Amino acid sequence: MSQTTYPLKPVVPFIKVTQDRAVLEIQRGCIRGCRFCQAGMVYRPTRPRDINMLKETARAMLKNTGHEEITLSSLSSSDYNELEEIVTFLIDEFHTQGVNISLPSLRIDAFSLDVMSKVQDVRKSSLTFAPEAGTQRMRNVINKGLTEDDILNGAGQAFEGGWTKVKLYFMLGLPTETQEDMEGIAVLADKVARRYYEIPKDQRNGKCQITASSSFFVPKPFSPLQWATMQPMEEYIRRAGIVQEAFRNQLNRKSLRYNWHTAEVTVLEGVFARGDRKVGKVLEEAYRLGCIYDAWDEYFDYDKWLQAFENTGVDMDCLLYTSDA
C-alpha cells in the first residue's frame, strides 16, 4: 500500500461542499468479520500504510488544498496500530493553523481516550460509534463482536473526556430480528445517556445528546448474508415506527434523538446490490425519465423508478425477496 500512488493535489471545489476536507486513507481492509459487511470481505487482507508515508502525504495535501480538516479514513481507524502517532503528528504540525482531525470509523471497544482527547484539543466535535444492533443476541448473529459492557465503557470514557454528543448507528431488518431487538435500540441509547448522567453534575458539560440512526439491512454480494431476504418496504417503515415509539418511552428521552433511512431508497439499494446486468437497463431508463439528482430528497421520485422497472420488464420482487435471483 505504501508504494501505491496517492493524490497529493486533489481537486478543490470553488463552492462550499459537504465533504470539504482532505481525506487520508491510513489502511485498507478490516481485521473484523461482520457478516453484513461487503467491504470487510472483499478488501482482505488488511493493509496498513507506512506511517512516514502518511505524514508526508498529509503535509502535501493540506499545503496544496488549504483545507481546514483532514479525515483519517479506513474501515476501522481505531485498529490502525500507529493511530496515536499520526494524530499526534497532525496536531503538532498543524495546531497553529486550526486544522481539525476527523476519525469517522471508530469501534467503541477500541476507543482511545488519549487519542480523542488530543483531537478535542484542536476542535470539539461529536463521536460516532456503530453498535449495529440493540441486543447482544442480534450482535452475535451478525458477528459484531461487541458487548453491552464494551459499548457503555467506551461511551463512559468519551463522556469523562469531555464529549457530550454521541451518534450511534444501527440496522433494522437483520435476519432473525425480533421486536425485542428493535426496541433494544432505544433501550441501549437510553443506557448510554444514563451513563453520562452518572457523572457528578459539577463535572458534566451540560446535557448530553445521543443521536441514534438506523439504516435498513441490504444483503450485499460477497458477504455471508448475501442470500438473506430483504423485508418489504412497508415492513421497514413499521419497524422504524416500533423503534421510534420505544424512544418515547425511555427515561432520558429528552437527551435522545432518532432518525432512519428512507425506505424507498433502501429498496433501490437492494435492487442494485443484488441485481445482474439487467438493472443497467433500469438505470438508463430512470435517467431518461428524469431521475438525475436522486441522491437529494427533494429530487427523489420513487414513482419514476417504479415506472423504469415496468418499462424494462425487470421484476423488483424477484431481486429483493428471493434467494435465487
Language model region names:
Residues 15-52:
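Canonical Radical SAM [4Fe-4S] cluster-binding loop centered on the CxxxCxxC motif
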Residues 214-260, 265-294:
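Radical SAM enzyme [4Fe-4S]-AdoMet core and its adjacent flexible, acidic
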Residues 321-325:
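Conserved small/polar residues in nucleotide/adenosyl-binding loops
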Residues 59-211, 215, 219:
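Conserved SAM/AdoMet-binding glycine-rich loop
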Residues 41, 141-146, 226-232:
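Short glycine-enriched, charge-decorated loop/helix-capping segments at active-site entrances
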Residues 1-23:
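N-terminal [4Fe-4S]-dependent radical SAM core
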Residues 5, 31-39, 63-71, 133-136, ...:
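Short acidic (Asp/Glu) and glycine-rich catalytic loops that position anionic groups and cofactors
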Residues 292-313:
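Sequence-structural signature of the catalytic-core scaffold of metal-dependent phosphohydrolases
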